[in-house]
Amino acid sequence: MITNDLIAQHSLTLTIASSVLLVFLLSRLLRKDATGKAQGCRPVAKRWQWDPILGLDIVLAQIGALKGNYYLPWLIELHSNMPKTFEINFFGKRQIYTSEPDNLKAMTATNFHDFGIEPMRRHTKGSMPFADKGISTVDGKEWEFSRFLLKPFFYREVYTSTDRIEPFADHMMALIPGDGESFNMQSLIQRWFLDLTTNFIFGKPMDALENPDRARITWAMLDVLKGGRLRAQFYMMMWAFNWTWWYKAVAEVHDFINVHIRETYKEIEEREQRIKDGKPVEPERTDLIWYMAWNLRDEELLRSQLCLVFVPNNDTTSIFISNCIWHLARHPEAWEKLRQEVLAHGDAPLTFEALRNMKYLQCVLNETHRLTPNNVTQIRVCLNDSVLPVGGGKNAKEPFFVRKGDVVSITKTVMYRDPEIWGNDAEEFKPERFDGRRVFWEFLPFGGGPRRCPAQMMVQTEAAYMLARLARVYRRIEARDPAPYTAVMRIGPSNKTGVQIAVYK
């Protein structure tokens, strides 16, 4: 029987335990603050919130921004009237936003081992059942192994080859409508890149250009990316969402990849048996899955690694090229300047070296990265107590202490529009700003430090090649959608209505 005395006794015990826990947490926090002060650190500014306990005001605002397709304006507004470094409460956790290049350098290079992604991506199970271990979910030795599996991305003969791009570009160019006819260039770019990337990753193209229905896998991948972003950002309340649509998309992507995995393992097994029997074998395949399968003989683990390469890679590159064309269609003077540079090359092959030497073309790529970056924010969890160099104190220029468990978000979309870095015309599309400009940590579209994107050179080559091919043929690109850029967030931002244009030879 529960008596009043027993209730009082348990209440007293609970009160004492809660008090001890509170004292412990406060003393731990004070010790950390004392450590920070001893290292010359100063506190960062705090953004006012109507819910300072759980930070649900920011949580709900972010959900609304993502659903309403105004996440980028919301992110810029979040930074407005604040120093370049400030902190918020997000689900009861300290989250630091910063647009200081020196903090990006420290987080991704100088203090690389103090920051990671695994606690917020893998440990939360937010990426499951889509993928578990892979290049974008793990840290430490597991990450080093995932990086090793992507070695073909680093082969110079791969990322410098434009011969592998040419046949797919030829096919896409043949599908572009005649002069003055409106069409969505983004859908063509997506189908072109599906063929190109499936050929590199799986050893054979999907033939999405020839058979548009096969590109339906793109919609499943987009759902996977959208859901993945939501689950990563709101992992503490995944229970509040209905994920049926996401699980369905995950299953569709898995079915597609499983076919290639099983075919590859079967071919490897047959090859090894022929070698064992002393029979001749064909030259080894050079595609990515072949290399990965040789080094990882586990179907589920291989699928996880492949999912975290194939799905994000397909989206980022096709969106980047589409964004280039979206900007150029609205700036005919930039298109003409680019076209004249390409035409000056004559009919000579568009090699890697030739494209790299087209300075204005490279400026266009950079300016597109700047205004519409695929990587809007670069987010890390602090793994060990650390110090970032800029943002503390009243002048927001002193070092500040970052506690283990804190989340740090480098907001590139704000950094890349900072007038102090880019001038008063930072909001304008002006490729000339990169002419002769040496950039460092204030502009790293593919990230910096050990975790920089392994596909950087490949992406730049593919984008440059496609723009150059278009410039050789079309004297004018005309925008057929007067609406401003409305970013739908996937792995990065994509314009809501695609790239509605007309072209003229």
From Swiss-Prot:
Its cofactor is heme. One of its GO terms (biological process) is ilicicolin H biosynthetic process. Keywords: Heme, Iron, Membrane, Metal-binding, Monooxygenase, Oxidoreductase, Transmembrane, Transmembrane helix. GO terms for cellular component: membrane. InterPro entries: Cyt_P450 (IPR001128), Cyt_P450_CS (IPR017972), Cyt_P450_E_CYP52_ascomycetes (IPR002974), Cyt_P450_E_CYP52_fungi (IPR047146), Cyt_P450_sf (IPR036396). Belongs to the cytochrome P450 family. This is Cytochrome P450 monooxygenase iliC. The lineage of its organism: Eukaryota, Fungi, Dikarya, Ascomycota, Pezizomycotina.
